[in-house]
Amino acid sequence: MFYSIVAIFVGAGLGALLRWFLSLALNAFFPAVPLGTLASNLIGGYVIGVAAVVFTVRVGLPPEWRLFVITGFLGGLTTFSTYSVEVMTHALEGEFGWALAVAALHLTGSFALTALGMWTARAWLAAA
């Protein structure tokens, strides 16, 4: 149990730090669509696709690795709450086109990158 807690704790901290760094580095470029939040969610979508396949196929991996990557790191990296407030801020300011665009970018992008991550992992594992 102790190692599980540590794995989640460390993973979440690293994921949250990466999200913060991405926001610092990217959000100023295009304020209408905060690119740091988008990058965090898209990267998270890709990584969870890879992780879902790897942890399903490589059943011998210690369970703490799954907790570190999926529960911790990706839980800290991805952010539904920030995405929600960004979409609703546009909507409440009457910018319905931007609200819809931001929502669509996050949802379709994340699904597409999750599928790409799963495909990547399957191809990588098949070649190994």
Swiss-Prot record:
Q: Which GO terms describe its biological process?
A: cellular detoxification of fluoride
Q: Which family does it belong to?
A: Belongs to the fluoride channel Fluc/FEX (TC 1.A.43) family.
Membrane topology of this protein:
Multi-pass membrane protein
Q: What does this protein do?
A: Fluoride-specific ion channel. Important for reducing fluoride concentration in the cell, thus reducing its toxicity.
Q: What is this protein called?
A: Fluoride-specific ion channel FluC
HAMAP family in the record: FluC (MF_00454)
Q: Where does the sequence pass through the membrane?
A: 5-25, 35-55, 67-87, 96-116
Q: What is the lineage of its organism?
A: Bacteria, Pseudomonadati, Pseudomonadota, Betaproteobacteria, Burkholderiales
List UniProt keywords, sorted A-Z: Cell inner membrane, Cell membrane, Ion channel, Ion transport, Membrane, Metal-binding, Sodium, Transmembrane, Transmembrane helix, Transport
* Single annotated GO MF: metal ion binding
Q: How is this protein activated or inhibited?
A: Na(+) is not transported, but it plays an essential structural role and its presence is essential for fluoride channel function.
Q: Which NCBIfam families match?
A: crcB, PRK14196.1
Pfam families, alphabetically?
A: CRCB
Please report the organism this UniProt entry assigns to the protein.
Answer: Burkholderia cenocepacia (strain HI2424)
For this chain, the annotated S-S bridges are none
Superkingdom per UniProt: Bacteria
Give a yes or no for keyword Membrane in this entry: yes
Q: Which InterPro entries match?
A: FluC
